[in-house]
Amino acid sequence: MKRSPEMTTLLKIALSAAAVAALSIAQASDAGAQAAQSYEAPPKEANAIFANYRFRNGETLPELGLNYTTLGQPRRNSHGAIDNAVLMLHWTSASGQALLTPEFRTALFAPGAPFDVTRYFVILPDAIGHGRSSKPSDGLRAAFPRYGYGDMVDLQHKLVTEVLGITRLRAIVGISMGCMNAWQWAEAYPDAMDGIMPIACFPSPITGRNLLWRRMVVDAIKSDPAWAGGNYKQQPPSATNGLAIVRLMIDGVPRLQEAAATTESADAFVRSVREQAVRVDANDVIYALEASRDFDTRPGLSRVKAKVLAVNFADDEFYRDSLQTLQHDIRIVPGARFVVRDVSDGSAGHLSMTRPALWADQARDFLAWLAEKP
C-alpha cells in the first residue's frame, strides 16, 4: 500500500506521540519505584559526638553523644540549601525510635501521608538523657550534669546546623516534652524554621497535676533506701511503683474504663505497666522529670517568627482545656493558630499524642499553611 505524504506525516506524529507516552509512563514508573524504595529504605541511625560540651548551668561532659535517626533524603534548592528537613521530637522517657512504629510510619511517613519521606527529610533525635544519647545510666549516675530542656534544644540545634548542615528547617513537630522543646526552638532560634507544630503541652511552665506527679515520682525514688543517693546496685522498687501509678494520670478515662472493665483485666493492665516500668533506670527517670524546671517560653512568645499550629486534646488531664491556658498564652504569638481535638474513638487522654492518626489531619493542614505564599 502506497502512503501519501500526509499519511506518512500523520504516522510519524502518531509514533512520536506513542514514544513520548511510553517514555512518560516509564518515567512515572521509575519515579514511583524510587519513591517506594525511598519509603521502604531502612532508617539511618548515627551518633553525633560533641567534645567538652558545656551545659547551660556550667557543668561539662568530656564527650557527649547525641543519637539520631533520619528518614528520606535531603533536598537542596537552587542556592544549595536543604529545604525539606522536618525535625520531630519525642516525649519524656522515650526516644526517636518511638516515632518509628508501624502506627507512626503509616499515619505520618508513608507515601501520601503528611510527612511523606519521599518528599521530606525527617530527623528524629534522642534527647539528651534519653534513648541512645548520653545519660546518667551510662556510668556517671548522679554525677551526670543536671541538664534542662534548654540544653536539649541547644544540642538539637547543634545537630541540625553543625552536623547535618541545615540552616533552616521546614518544620518542627514536638510531642509532650518535644512539644515544649518546639516552643523553645521558636523562642531561642526564631529564624531556624518555617513553622512549629507543638502537640500536647502549654507554652507556660509545668504546674498542677503535671508538676505534682513528677515531684511525687522523684520523691518516691529518692526516699527509697535502695536508691542509695543514686549509687544503687539494683533498680529501686519505688521507680517501678511510681511509674505504674503515672499511667492512671496520663491515660484517658474512657480508655481506662475499657482496659479495666473487670478485676482480671485491671490486674492484667497493672502487670503490663509494671513490665514496661522495670526497663527504665531510676537516675534516668529523675533527670528526665527534673529537666523541665527551666521551661517557660512566655517571655519570648511575642518575638516568635515561625508559623505555629498548636494541637491539644480535650481529654488530656495534664493540659486541661477548661483551664484555657493555651488559649490565653497563644494570643501573644503573632498569627498563631491552635486546635483542641474533641474526644473521639481512639482518644487516650494525654496519650492521644502517641496516636498519630488522631492528629494527622492537623499535620496536613499545618503543611498546607506553610506552603501558602506570604
Model-derived regions, located:
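Conserved hydrolase catalytic core segment
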Residues: 168-207
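Catalytic active-site module of serine/aspartate enzymes centered on a nucleophile-bearing elbow/loop
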Residues: 336-374
